[in-house]
Regions:
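Extended, low-polarity transmembrane helix blocks
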Residues: 1-33, 39, 47-53, 57, ...
Length: 129
């Protein structure tokens, strides 16, 4: 039974990467193009806007699985910085400081630094060529 389940691991790794990539890419899209429902709209050229551009570009690379380890490393650092700069000063506990997404995504991205993109990715296609 376990072997049957383990056979799905590579594909599920790619599915996880795509799902997380869509989330981080959408964060960047919302900050850059100001189309989200929230009230936070960073001014063009401000630090939050630049970080949104970073989320947009690295999020897209992560989403499609191109240079995944590099994009994941950069995004992991970005999420760690976001947590410690924006959330940690409010409280040490993520449920109290609103930093759950940043904390979890930091470690998800760190995992992809070691695992790579998975079989459904540009990286996998380039490695076969």
């Amino acid at each position: 039974m376990v072997n049957k389940i383990q056979a799905y691991q590579p594909v599920l790794l790619s599915i996880l990467r795509i799902a997380v990539g869509l989330v981080i890419f959408s964060f960047g899209m919302a900050k850059i193009f100001h189309f989200h429902a929230g009230t936070f709209m960073p001014p063009t050229g401000s630090l939050p806007w630049i970080l949104g551009l970073f989320e947009l570009v690295c999020g897209f690379l992560f989403l499609v699985g191109f240079q995944t380890r590099i994009a994941a490393f950069l995004l992991s650092g970005l999420m760690a910085a976001a947590y410690f700069i924006s959330h940690f000063p409010k409280s040490i506990f993520p449920p109290e400081n609103g930093g759950m997404a940043a904390a979890v995504l930091c470690f998800v991205f760190l995992y992809f630094v070691t695992s790579g993109a998975g079989p459904i990715s540009v990286d996998a296609k380039l490695n076969k060529a």
